[in-house]
């Protein structure tokens, strides 16, 4: 609704005991931040978004055998990267929800959507997330910045010590060979970032039957359907496909298959037709 509330707690001694005076400041935002790529959410919203997604439903992160404790314990900036599609923003939301700063906001900054108003707010406003303290920032599409914008943004981060006062996450897409945009190599060096690679679906195709079963059960409840699973040959067809769009494509294909199936088991013909359209 365009209203922002800022809370500040100040410790004081009163009658021999430590008390906290909380002040609440109400202000109206001058621009609609979400329209320009800056969005705020809290821990509960992040948890709900994650567990309502394919990745939360299927627990596909555990399937990928990722060890996350080292990333939770460190305060260093983290680059989460991988092929397009394998759950990078969802991973950040899970790390935020499990991390020590989950009582403060998660601030998502999409550099591809900033445009002039968002960029001006980020770089010049005294309410910029870069000026904050004790928050979690997730920046995506850094490659959309010009070289000049990139230099200005990260010079500002370094000057304000944003990376020391907050937890920074960067979401990056890489090629199948693992190559990322040069901006990410620079920020890794500048900010001494940790790296977390999200494995593509093709690296554990053997898990497709289990993942399919879990997600189909949820789709049945959402859509009042009664699909049990795949015919054996259809299962084989799913595991032999390369899934270039990774989990996002896999999720979309399952949505279509369940929607258009009128029998208890999804046939191999239905699967082949859908994959041809991919």
Q: What is each residue range found by the language model?
A:
Residues 7-9:
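Compact sensory input modules in signal-transduction proteins
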Residues 143-146, 158:
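Catalytic acidic motif of RecA-like/P-loop NTPases
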Residues 12-62:
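Sensory coupling linkers of modular signal transduction proteins
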Residues 57-59, 66, 83, 87, ...:
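Nucleotide-binding/hydrolysis machinery
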Residues 145-153:
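Conserved ATPase-coupling elements of RecA-like P-loop NTPase cores
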Residues 67-143, 200-205:
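Conserved post-Walker A coupling segment in P-loop NTPases
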Residues 117, 147-148, 181, 206:
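Conserved D-loop-proximal element of ABC-family nucleotide-binding domains
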Residues 2-5:
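Per-ARNT-Sim (PAS) sensory domains and their PAS-associated C-terminal
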